[in-house]
Amino acid sequence: MKSRFAPSPTGCLHIGGARTALFAWVWAKKQHGKFVLRIEDTDLERSNQASVDAILQGMNWLGLDYDEGPFYQTDRFNRYKQVVRQLLDEKKAYYCECSKERLQILHEDLIKQGKKVRYDGCCRDKNLNDGVVRFNNPEDGLVIFNDVIKGQISINNKELDDLIIVRSDGTPTYNLTVVVDDHDMQIDCVIRGDDHINNTPKQINLYQALGWHLPEFAHLPMILSSDGARLSKRHDAVSIMTYRDAGFLPEALLNYLARLGWSYGDQEIFSMDEIVKLFELKSINKAPASFNQDKLLWLNQKIIKNSSVENLLNNLTWHLQNQAITITNAPNIEAVVQYLQNRCKTLVDMAGEVKMFYQDFDTFDEKLAKRYLKDKTPLKHLFAKLEALRIWKANNIKQAVKEVCFELNISFGKVGQPFRLALSGNGNAGSIDIVAELVGKNKALSRLKMAIDS
């Protein structure tokens, strides 16, 4: 059993495309089948290698590995010509010489008459030998198919056009190439966005004209943005790699994409194995799904919190390099990540907090310094107690802070806040006892002294 993902390389891998790829990938895994990647690059003017690279990068980051491909339609032009020749020889296609001007007049006349705009078959019986090639669509009968998601769909052939299958420059069009490719690649289930549903009856007629077995069709509901408009490449932050750059885990994005139109009870978080086990195409909603950035962020935070340190480190490395953060031998980076995973919503946040454990600073936040470093007495007392500690552990550090509070008869905050600022430079240090332990005694005392001397 095979499914496929067939993007056009005219831009990055975006949210809608990634969800289509995910559902096709999951379907293939569930069927113990194969997932095929095909690059539909017949639009020679708009297709480009940079977009191909972006699509492959996005799929690699998401972990959507393909079993076959990537196949490129531009490598298969001879095959398409062979099929077109067959259709021409069998009078199931014909050459058309109608000019753009004639077609424009026809278009305007049909609109004036309140009729559906479609080609009138002017060249159908002329037996021409040149021009664009049109498919000789049946004039009578119905095209009926059962969409796995949307149910039975019926279209009268009178509503369909004699579509162009070869352009004037000799390049094949989408509706021809997709039929030939899905047949040759033995695709059993065509999973794609519902913006393709109007093409399906045309493609079914092509299948039947060629005497080929029909695959199943499953058209996914559209994804709406927060303003209710259809999510598209023109909306901000829809590129998959934008989410990598913003610090989202790939499994968080995959989990969220799976829930855009599909659900299993009230369960919010799934492993990929669970998605494969529980997923059913027929369970996908027909109604559009809404993309909610806040929900994705919430999900990312949950998955960071429950992820393994090893997985977080694998994904964090890119962000550390991106922020020019060098990890030295001490403190142990695994221990730092284990502490931070309970605090951070994104890996960008985590990388920012990792910095204070490995990179020294020579200034303090000016506003916080005016507030917390006016009276150096608490820090001087704390420095003395911490310097005397023989065992540098969080519990002992916390106890030293409490002792200073007791001896000076001040609140915990009067010691804790200056200490937090001293450790981090910006006051964003979380649990000061744990941070101080991880930073290490020498570095913690050095930063305390700098705060006292400031």
UniProtKB/Swiss-Prot annotation:
Annotated residues for binding of ATP: 233
Pfam families per the UniProt record, alphabetical: Anticodon_2, tRNA-synt_1c
Sorted UniProt keywords: Aminoacyl-tRNA synthetase, ATP-binding, Cytoplasm, Ligase, Metal-binding, Nucleotide-binding, Protein biosynthesis, Zinc
Enzyme class: ligase
Manner of cofactor binding, per the entry note: Binds 1 zinc ion per subunit.
The UniProt record lists the keyword Chloroplast: no
Residue interval(s) of motif 'HIGH' region: 7-17
Motif 'KMSKS' region positions after renumbering to this chain: 230-234
Main location: cytoplasm
Cofactor(s) in the UniProt record: Zn(2+)
Catalytic activity: tRNA(Glu) + L-glutamate + ATP = L-glutamyl-tRNA(Glu) + AMP + diphosphate
GO cellular component, one term: cytosol
EC number: 6.1.1.17
CDD domains: GluRS_core
Sequence positions that bind Zn(2+): 96, 98, 123, 125
Localization (cell): Cytoplasm
GO biological process, one term: glutamyl-tRNA aminoacylation
GO molecular function: ATP binding; glutamate-tRNA ligase activity; tRNA binding; zinc ion binding
Record family assignment: Belongs to the class-I aminoacyl-tRNA synthetase family. Glutamate--tRNA ligase type 1 subfamily.
Job description of the protein: Catalyzes the attachment of glutamate to tRNA(Glu) in a two-step reaction: glutamate is first activated by ATP to form Glu-AMP and then transferred to the acceptor end of tRNA(Glu).
Subunit details: Monomer.
PANTHER family: GLUTAMATE--TRNA LIGASE, GLUTAMATE--TRNA LIGASE, MITOCHONDRIAL-RELATED
Protein's UniProt name: Glutamate--tRNA ligase
